[in-house]
UniProtKB/Swiss-Prot annotation:
GO terms for molecular function: unfolded protein binding. It is found in: Endoplasmic reticulum membrane. Residues 1-20 form the signal peptide. Glycans are attached at N52, N130. This is Protein rot1. Residues 236 are cytoplasmic.
Amino acid sequence: MIVEYFLFNLLVTIISASNAADLVGTWTTKSRSVVTGPAFYDPINDIFIEPNLTGMSYSFTEDGHFEEAYYRALANPTEPSCPKGIMQWQHGTYSVKSDGSIELTPIAVDGRQLVSDPCSKDVGMYTRYNQSETFNLFTVSTDAYHHVRRLDLASFDDAPMHPMYLVYKPPQMLPTTTLNPASLETGKSKRHVRRDIARSASVGGFIRSDDLINPDRWLWFGIFMTAMGGIAIIYS
């Protein structure tokens, strides 16, 4: 399948040899609404800024750093009027392997994810996000229709991703160092922050409040609730 996909690209694009240097810059999908950098995630206030349209963006530097931004809508077959919204951001380092694959290694404490389910919850789930990624193949070309540089990625299972187009070179990114060192957890201290949703992304206006939560806490919370016989416990 992946071979046929890239053979098709040969017919519609002007192909150039792809190497690590070709990746440098900021790439975004056709809507151009989602772009990495401070217009998507504000690390000072720890909030997302909602784009006008869904999409994704990747940035790569010459010295091996990356940043990614996603804004997606997930269909709800049982209630079509209630799609979920997901915003994701992370950054870290990348390497291009000898077989042409790309491996992304995020800074674990910095990644963020915001999930909105407007018809089942009054709150948006705001959590840390840390997901290593592998792209089995990439090509950089000049798109024959748009006449701009185009990046095609094949995911870990060889499925082609949406093409992205170069919008900035050098890339538009946040600092490549750790942005949230206070988020590091120890056995004695865990961070649980409640933030004013008025300053956060609404994901289509569906979210009224949000929390930065360590996902592991939900397991222990559930065990504790069961042990207490279902007594409601509220704490900050």
